[in-house]
């Protein structure tokens, strides 16, 4: 019973996380952590570590899929990533000094709101419009936004993907596919940094649960990324919005349960 229950929980956690990653560049931590904590009674710090490591491969595969379809801004992604990484470490250290109950609620609510935004006000920016911004201005914007995202990411251990998507589409004016592609590209590295630091501070995870989460998240992220790159902008906005709203509601439900 226990084994089957663990597989079922990790399957659905991985499915939610993978779809969120492939469609919206959402951090797997937002879905996997609450499920592992609520149903498997796992230590919150360890659950976030497992979720972040599930994120690494899922984001890498998604980023590769977006890159293959020319929907990835590597240059500005690298600039933003540098500032995100530095401040994720700062945020993570601050978080290890505060009680873990404060984490998570904020990012879940944001996921839900962002989902509604994509359904009600789709991002219809085109690649042509994106070219209109000067390289220097975009680089500076990338650094400033990266600092903000990194600190909040490290502190909450989630919400980074959502914040990145919000900032890339709203502040930096990216077209949706490029925003998601760039977001998952950055997240591959931020999740890796986060996972390694979590395991170094908190010790090794339950390897069985870890392996299941990694495999299931990877599988669903690949499916979602392939679909997202083939879809037209309107359909993609709607699909992304629905995935985010459903995940937001489900996770809020878990938080109430626990």
Predicted regions and their residues:
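Juxtamembrane transmembrane-helix boundary motif
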Residues: 1-19, 33-39, 44, 65-151, ...
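Hydrophobic, membrane-facing alpha-helical anchors
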Residues: 1-6, 10, 53-64, 159-168
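Transmembrane helix-bundle signature of multi-pass membrane transporters/permeases
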Residues: 18, 48-56, 180-191, 244
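Transmembrane helix boundary and interhelical junction motifs in multipass membrane proteins
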Residues: 23-32, 157-167
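Membrane-interface alpha-helices at helix entry/exit sites of multi-pass transporters
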Residues: 42-50, 75-76, 173-184
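A small-residue-rich subset of transmembrane alpha-helices
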Residues: 54, 182-198, 208-221
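Short, structured loop/turn "capping" segments at alpha-beta junctions
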Residues: 126-127, 158-163, 174-178
